[in-house]
């Protein structure tokens, strides 16, 4: 039995957004050292194959989270194209950053990250020392989001928006500009 291809609508405008190098860089330079060093010494369980599989899964999840920003920026653009078009046309990245940034939403996200890290970061092998022997500290997860995940997601959103008008005819552009928010 074969499963037919799903026919999903094209949501995103054609683009060439790619921050994979930045994702790999912060993963290898920040995340890996955090989870492989204890008491100042590198840990080595000699499970290299398993480690590679976990690294690929982690990198894939991080990239998926960051690249999802394109769908978020497309949604924001569609909600009020007239607000975005001038900033896109002048390539004003600061204006685009202001249009996509919602500080209250970011704060809620950071609170959720902290809460989830508190729960999922526990080391349940040693229940009497669970708080002291965490797999990862909640504050470190929040810092990763503040320093890497959120900024890279915004970079993806802005890079996508800068390409959002590419290939549109003058009539299509005029229709977008005249659409009420």
Where is each model-derived feature located?
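Extended amphipathic alpha-helical regions
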Residues: 4-181
């Amino acid at each position: 039995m074969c499963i037919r291809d799903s026919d999903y609508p094209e949501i995103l405008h054609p683009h060439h957004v790619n921050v994979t190098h930045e994702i790999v860089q912060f993963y290898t330079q920040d995340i890996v050292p955090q989870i492989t060093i204890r008491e100042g010494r590198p840990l080595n369980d000699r499970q290299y194959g398993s480690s590679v599989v976990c690294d690929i899964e982690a990198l894939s999840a991080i990239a998926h989270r960051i690249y999802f920003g394109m769908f978020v920026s497309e949604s924001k653009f569609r909600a009020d194209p007239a607000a975005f078009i001038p900033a896109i046309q002048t390539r004003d990245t600061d204006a685009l950053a202001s249009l996509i940034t919602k500080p209250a939403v970011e704060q809620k996200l950071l609170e959720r990250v902290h809460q989830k890290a508190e729960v999922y970061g526990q080391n349940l092998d040693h229940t009497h020392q669970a708080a002291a022997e965490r797999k990862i500290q909640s504050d470190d997860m929040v810092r990763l989001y503040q320093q890497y995940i959120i900024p890279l997601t915004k970079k993806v959103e802005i890079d996508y928006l800068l390409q959002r008008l590419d290939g549109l005819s003058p009539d299509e552009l005029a229709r977008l500009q005249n659409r009420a928010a």
